[in-house]
Amino acid sequence: MASENMTPQDYIGHHLNNLQLDLRTFSLVDPQNPPATFWTINIDSMFFSVGLGLLFLVLFRSVAKKATSGVPGKFQTAIELVIGFVNGSVKDMYHGKSKLIAPLALTIFVWVFLMNLMDLLPIDLLPYIAEHVLGLPALRVVPSADVNVTLSMALGVFILILFYSIKMKGIGGFTKELTLQPFNHWAFIPVNLILEGVSLLSKPVSLGLRLFGNMYAGELIFILIAGLLPWWSQWILNVPWAIFHILIITLQAFIFMVLTIVYLSMASEEH
């Protein structure tokens, strides 16, 4: 176990605590005595998500500036493969005309993948540095295991769904879609509104919770292995799970991207 002074329950609970800032006092929250208030922010999730987003921009910009028509390097080849894969997915699933969808899909796929990839770091590495070097009370390094992050991303997708729906169908067409489907009669407007409203709202909710649930479960398994087993036996389970987890983090990034494209394609369809 990583800490001899903690029980397994304390160890697991410690690694599930976020580094929070109380916006009323601008002071760090004590994980052992959190305030019962809405006005807190998970600054570790904010730091790592923004940092990884900037890393994505810097890497792709540097490759774009150094791109040549000759024989590309290994890193440039890998980037081109990712771009080609995402662009092909967009062409297959999005049938409207928009210059935003392909860059958006690429950003979502790479950004979510990088956030998920943080789950493969040794579970005690950064939290130990944060606690013993920086004096921080807690630290979680996987932004996509924070429901606030995943639902915020899903909210952004939801706003785009509304934007494309109104842009392609107009206010009247969008309103008619909500009130006159699936039953095309004025008497069923309340029923249609409930059904279509639930269907519309379920898209961002399921999108965000799916990513959160899978990444939270993956993070929890790593914590359980480290917290319940002696150090010399952790590798027996850690290595196979880490190898399998590479598939999970890639698949979850792909699913988030695909569902975003599909939802925006549905919103762009004219009826």
Swiss-Prot record:
GO terms for biological process: proton motive force-driven plasma membrane ATP synthesis. The keyword Membrane applies. The chain crosses the membrane at residues 40-60, 100-120, 146-166, 220-240, 242-262. SUPFAM superfamilies: F1F0 ATP synthase subunit A (SSF81336). Its main location: membrane. One of its GO terms (cellular component) is plasma membrane. It is a multi-pass membrane protein. Pfam families: ATP-synt_A. One of its GO terms (molecular function) is proton-transporting ATP synthase activity, rotational mechanism. Keywords: ATP synthesis, Cell inner membrane, Cell membrane, CF(0), Hydrogen ion transport, Ion transport, Membrane, Transmembrane, Transmembrane helix, Transport. It comes from the Bacteria. It is found in: Cell inner membrane. The keyword Nucleotide-binding does not apply. F-type ATPases have 2 components, CF(1) - the catalytic core - and CF(0) - the membrane proton channel. CF(1) has five subunits: alpha(3), beta(3), gamma(1), delta(1), epsilon(1). CF(0) has three main subunits: a(1), b(2) and c(9-12). The alpha and beta chains form an alternating ring which encloses part of the gamma chain. CF(1) is attached to CF(0) by a central stalk formed by the gamma and epsilon chains, while a peripheral stalk is formed by the delta and b chains. NCBIfam families: ATP_synt_6_or_A, PRK05815.1-1. Belongs to the ATPase A chain family. Key component of the proton channel; it plays a direct role in the translocation of protons across the membrane. This is ATP synthase subunit a. The lineage of its organism: Bacteria, Pseudomonadati, Pseudomonadota, Gammaproteobacteria, Enterobacterales.
